[in-house]
């Protein structure tokens, strides 16, 4: 399958640079995943599309202040570092800029030595494995020294760092936010639970690979980055009961979807599970774990728009994206949302 089949024209001015003041005031495009019929709403209207007995699956990962600015201890040369994922105690896969200055044995210092790191391996893809040393608790030191790693297409400074976190973020570990969740507020979640909707949290730590373009012409040849996930038994039980009782499972975001599909494919049912997943979902594959998906509008030719197309059809999704451009929707991380559902849109 040609990657160019997932291309579309997006005016640069429709890439959202800042979040809206009210998380729930973003536009919401409701799309019937089977017919392609669509309707324009506001995100706070999404409550009306849920029924008692449905379950909303949320990714409770928390974005780390993973961008660090420091120096080489030997020369004082400036280094920018981005933490990608933890591989063992105090050991992280990172991106260093400029990478050529960071070789095995190089020692880096951040915050006048409050945090130090030694390069232990240079990876083939340009990444660097670093072992950190510090006094106290690592994440407290990181909170003090690090800054939020915004996506490369966002050029504005983010005044309130919490706006790049979901209101239910709990588990530290992501290099990027699961952005579909940014639309929810505690009040909106309460309105859903008051209606009889259950929440099923899981964790998938989002890596920067989510922003990497597909570099091959043939979609089938693309290799996904791996990300760590956990589905707790408490949530797995809710999901099993939802299916048993005829309720719908609605995933918030592609990260929740990839986690559920990983568990279903590996275990055949919703069970407690954890590990690393590099699952790549694109048209031609059946998505078994969810009935609906809440997601943002994604980059052209990205693995994310391919996943969304797998839940519907490529033609329906590209039509919806053309409509979003025509209706001046805001795109990407701080942009508007789509709700893919089987609901008839003739009411």
Swiss-Prot record:
Compartments it resides in: Cytoplasm
Keyword S-adenosyl-L-methionine: yes
Pfam families: Queuosine_synth (PF02547)
EC annotation from Swiss-Prot or TrEMBL: 2.4.99.17
Main location as per UniProt: cytoplasm
Coiled coil (UniProt feature): none
GO biological process, one term: tRNA wobble guanine modification
Disulfide pattern: none
Catalytic activity: 7-aminomethyl-7-carbaguanosine(34) in tRNA + S-adenosyl-L-methionine = epoxyqueuosine(34) in tRNA + adenine + L-methionine + 2 H(+)
Gene Ontology molecular functions: S-adenosylmethionine:tRNA ribosyltransferase-isomerase activity
Pathway stated in the Swiss-Prot or TrEMBL entry: tRNA modification; tRNA-queuosine biosynthesis
UniProt entry keywords in alphabetical sequence: Cytoplasm, Queuosine biosynthesis, S-adenosyl-L-methionine, Transferase
Domain of life of the native organism: Bacteria
InterPro entries named in the record: QueA, QueA_dom1, QueA_dom2, QueA_sf
GO cellular component term of the entry, any: cytoplasm
Protein family (similarity comment): Belongs to the QueA family.
PANTHER family: S-ADENOSYLMETHIONINE:TRNA RIBOSYLTRANSFERASE-ISOMERASE
Function: Transfers and isomerizes the ribose moiety from AdoMet to the 7-aminomethyl group of 7-deazaguanine (preQ1-tRNA) to give epoxyqueuosine (oQ-tRNA).
Quaternary structure and interacting proteins, as annotated: Monomer.
Protein name: S-adenosylmethionine:tRNA ribosyltransferase-isomerase
Source organism of this protein record: Exiguobacterium sibiricum (strain DSM 17290 / CCUG 55495 / CIP 109462 / JCM 13490 / 255-15)
Classification lineage: Bacteria, Bacillati, Bacillota, Bacilli, Bacillales
Gene name of the record: queA
């Amino acid at each position: 399958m040609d990657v160019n089949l997932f291309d579309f024209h997006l005016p640069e001015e429709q890439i959202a640079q800042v979040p809206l003041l009210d998380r729930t005031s973003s536009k919401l495009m409701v799309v019937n995943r089977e017919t392609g019929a669509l309707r324009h709403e506001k995100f706070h209207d999404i409550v009306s599309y849920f029924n008692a007995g449905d379950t909303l699956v949320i990714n409770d990962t928390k974005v780390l202040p993973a961008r660090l600015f420091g120096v080489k201890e030997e020369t004082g040369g400036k280094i920018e570092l981005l933490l990608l994922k933890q591989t063992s105690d105090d050991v992280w896969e990172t991106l260093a800029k400029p990478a050529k200055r960071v070789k095995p044995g190089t020692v880096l210092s951040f915050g006048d030595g409050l945090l130090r790191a030694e390069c232990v391996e240079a990876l083939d893809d340009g990444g660097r494995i670093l072992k950190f040393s510090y006094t106290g608790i690592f994440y407290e030191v990181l909170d003090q020294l690090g800054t939020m790693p915004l996506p490369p297409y966002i050029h504005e400074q983010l005044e309130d760092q919490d706006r790049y976190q979901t209101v239910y973020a709990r588990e530290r570990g992501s290099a990027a936010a699961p952005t579909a969740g940014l639309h929810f507020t505690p009040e909106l979640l309460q309105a859903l639970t008051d209606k009889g909707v259950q929440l099923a949290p899981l964790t998938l730590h989002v890596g920067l690979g989510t922003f990497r373009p597909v570099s091959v012409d043939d979609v089938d040849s693309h290799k996904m980055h791996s990300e760590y996930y956990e589905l707790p038994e408490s949530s797995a039980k809710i999901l099993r009961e939802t299916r048993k009782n005829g309720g719908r499972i609605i995933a918030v975001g592609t990260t929740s979807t990839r986690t559920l599909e990983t568990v279903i494919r590996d275990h055949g049912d919703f069970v407690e599970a954890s590990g690393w997943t590099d699952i790549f979902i694109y048209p031609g594959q059946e998505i078994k774990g969810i009935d609906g998906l809440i997601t943002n509008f994604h980059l052209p030719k990205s693995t994310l728009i391919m996943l969304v197309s797998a839940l519907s059809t490529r033609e329906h999704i590209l039509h919806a994206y053309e409509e979003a451009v025509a209706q001046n929707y805001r795109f990407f991380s701080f942009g508007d949302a789509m709700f893919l559902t089987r609901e008839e849109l003739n009411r």
